């Protein structure tokens, strides 16, 4: 007899993306978002800092913040969503918090994070299926 949790794990594995980069809070990432406008499909980049990571299996989400024309813009992306076509980790930062919500109250140079210099693996650009 199959356990209910085993059935859910099989379904989640079927719909999850397996080639995801290691995303951490404080990373500067570039996401490729597939957008359909007037019958045409294009990929729109969204580049920003990961301020929160909520791990929940197939429902894992990241909150990405960027400053656009002097206004802070935050978007929450489900990592396993079909609209995400690519994820690039551009830079890692050294942070000591799990959530960087304090960046919302800071402006200008105060929003900079200390960069962590580490050797990145050669495959950081992941084209997701």
UniProtKB/Swiss-Prot annotation:
It is found in: Plastid. Coiled coil: none annotated. This is Large ribosomal subunit protein bL19c. Keywords: Plastid, Ribonucleoprotein, Ribosomal protein. One of its GO terms (cellular component) is ribonucleoprotein complex. The lineage of its organism: Eukaryota, Viridiplantae, Chlorophyta, core chlorophytes, Trebouxiophyceae. NCBIfam families: rplS_bact. GO terms for molecular function: structural constituent of ribosome. Belongs to the bacterial ribosomal protein bL19 family. One of its GO terms (biological process) is translation. Its main location: plastid.
């Amino acid at each position: 007899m199959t356990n209910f949790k085993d059935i859910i794990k099989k379904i989640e594995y079927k719909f999850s993306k397996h080639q995801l980069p290691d995303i951490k809070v404080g990373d500067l990432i570039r996401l490729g978002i597939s957008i359909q406008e007037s019958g045409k499909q294009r990929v729109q980049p969204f580049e920003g800092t990961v301020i929160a990571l909520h791990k929940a299996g197939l429902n894992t989400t990241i909150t990405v913040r960027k400053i656009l024309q002097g206004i802070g813009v935050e978007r929450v992306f489900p990592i396993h969503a079909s609209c995400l076509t690519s994820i690039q980790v551009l830079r890692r930062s050294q942070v000591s918090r799990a959530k960087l919500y304090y960046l919302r109250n800071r402006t200008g140079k105060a929003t900079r994070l200390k960069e962590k210099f580490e050797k990145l693996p050669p495959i950081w650009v992941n084209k997701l299926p």
